[in-house]
Amino acid sequence: LSVVFDYDGNLWFATGGFRIYPQRQQQGVIGYIARSAIDAILNGEQTDLSKAVFVYELTPGEGAENGIAASKDGAVILTNQNCYLLRAEEGVDVVWRTPYESAGAKVSGEGDKTTGGGLAWGGGCSPTLTPNLVLFTDNQDPVNLLALDMKTGEVVASTPVLDDLPEGYQVAVENSAIVYDDGNGTVSTIVCNWFGAGNAGLADPN
């Protein structure tokens, strides 16, 4: 689903993707391949991957649906239930885990502001980072933009993406937010409304 190098050269990955009935079973893992193994492979050397690949197994019903973001603090991964800051420490070290709310991959009705008609069961927004913040959207009614403290995972701000929608319009977010940090305490964001661009049929019981 997604791969990204962290600042230490470890390669983080998330497997899984979009699925019907996510509560039925655990699907996919998140983890990393140690830089030492990658360097060895690139140098044409033999390496024991059983000692270089580390995974964090998600619980049944939880899965990654978005891209990974890397910072000097670690790798930020958003699942349909939690946002994680993970660090490579001879294994996957969970620095923090922040749960968030989601209405799920439901079919939107008239006037509904959730992500019905989108792809993700959780927030469809890959995390966007500033030096101090992690930003992503949830999948509530209405859909909110959340800002988490990079060091602690605490939610420091939350605001509806659009809090005054015309009748019959919905919000669905399936892309990363555009973020600008002016370095003086002001962070500006642009969030794209993806609603109407496609429906994977994840809420269809058939």
Residues covered by each model-derived region:
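Extracytoplasmic/lumenal domain signature
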Residues: 1-14, 18-206
